[in-house]
A protein has these predicted regions:
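Vicinal oxygen chelate
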Residues: 31-35, 86, 90-134
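N-terminal beta-strand motif that seeds the catalytic metal site of vicinal oxygen chelate
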Residues: 11-38, 88-91
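Core segments of cupin and vicinal oxygen chelate
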Residues: 28-71
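Active-site beta-strand termini and strand-to-loop segments that position acidic
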Residues: 64-68, 127-130, 139-140
């Protein structure tokens, strides 16, 4: 059986597709204090450290793994982009049970901007990190 990413027999675009974008490696979350952010994301959200090493100036390159996702998260603010800290990121995390996850995270001190709400597509909530960056927590 052929899957959605398998080349079709006789497909003239097979070679070209093999050079195209295949995955997302990481997204960056702008933070003011990398150590405080690292503690929040690992102790409260349960993310794992993939890389933590010196990078540029006083900053470190901190990359975190999230569950089974192949996409990592970096806690990094490029110089000159400090205005991005504390914004709505557009990043959405998935939980099997949004309400149970909301209760667990709230008990750990995670601040929720919006409590779980039933939508036509599922359940969602919005939470913030210590810098005010906002994220959606949604059902699969």
């Amino acid at each position: 059986m052929i899957g959605p990413s398998d080349p079709l027999p006789g497909d003239p675009f097979t070679e070209r597709r093999s050079r195209m974008i295949k995955a997302m490696k990481f997204v960056s979350i702008p933070v003011r204090d990398q150590q405080r952010a690292l503690e929040f994301y690992t102790t409260k959200l349960g993310f794992r450290v993939v890389t933590d090493q010196p990078f540029s100036g006083e900053q470190r390159w901190i990359e975190l793994g999230v569950g089974r996702s192949g996409t990592g998260i970096t806690l990094f603010t490029p110089p000159g982009h400090e205005e991005r800290v504390g914004t709505f990121t557009g990043i959405s995390f998935v939980a099997d049970d949004v309400k149970a996850t909301w209760r667990e995270l709230a008990a750990k001190g995670v601040v929720f901007i919006q409590e779980p709400k039933e939508e036509g597509w599922g359940t969602s909530a919005i939470f913030a990190d210590p810098d005010g960056n906002q994220f959606v927590l949604g059902s699969g």
